[in-house]
Amino acid sequence: MNWMEFISSIVKSIIWPVAIIILVFKLKQPVSNLISTLAKIKYKDWEFEFTIDQKLDKISFQLNKENQYGTDDQNLKDSLNLESNSEITEETHSHYNEKTSIKGDNDLLLKMEMIRLYGAVKNLYEKVSEKDDAADKSQGIGMLYMVDYLKRHKILNDSFAESLLDIMNIVHDLEKSHISQSYIMNKFFWNVDKSVKRLMEITSNYVAENTAGETSN
């Protein structure tokens, strides 16, 4: 082997390790940036889900107290100040697993639940505003207007009215993002169901009271 062949063999033996080192060095910064970006995205997803979870727990707690204290705002506020949201656990919502276990379109499920909630609010609103000529009687009346109207007429207490609007806002958040944790959706369905049942109860009581009043007159 002459000296040219010797040098050539050395070059061939080191060229691939050198190439790999150069490639790693060149890619080091972009890869680290990519990892950092992915970590930030994952953290934001986790932070978003945690925030939604906390909001749903607050609504669940308020709805539980609503069922205990009804439309008595002061008793409800005192109770909310004395107790913690921590009593709301995953077990509270566990029986709603069937809805989220369906491998279907989450957006469709959300829309169906909101139609239920909107319908319950509108039914109550129509009963209360039936003889009020100043009330909005249009078909596409907004949730915010109806809830505010019912609150002003002392049909809904402040806490329950706030919970209804919070649920509406959470729906918009859920529609924009993919929630990976099914228990969060379980809580959402639980809150909607509790709200609908409470609205139906309030409607029934309102109709009964007014029917009794008209009969006595």
Curated annotation (Swiss-Prot):
Keywords: Membrane, Transmembrane, Transmembrane helix
Protein's membrane topology: Single-pass membrane protein
Compartment(s) where it occurs, according to its Swiss-Prot or TrEMBL record: Membrane
Membrane-crossing segments per the record: 5-25
One term under GO cellular component: membrane
Protein name, as recorded: Uncharacterized protein YqbC
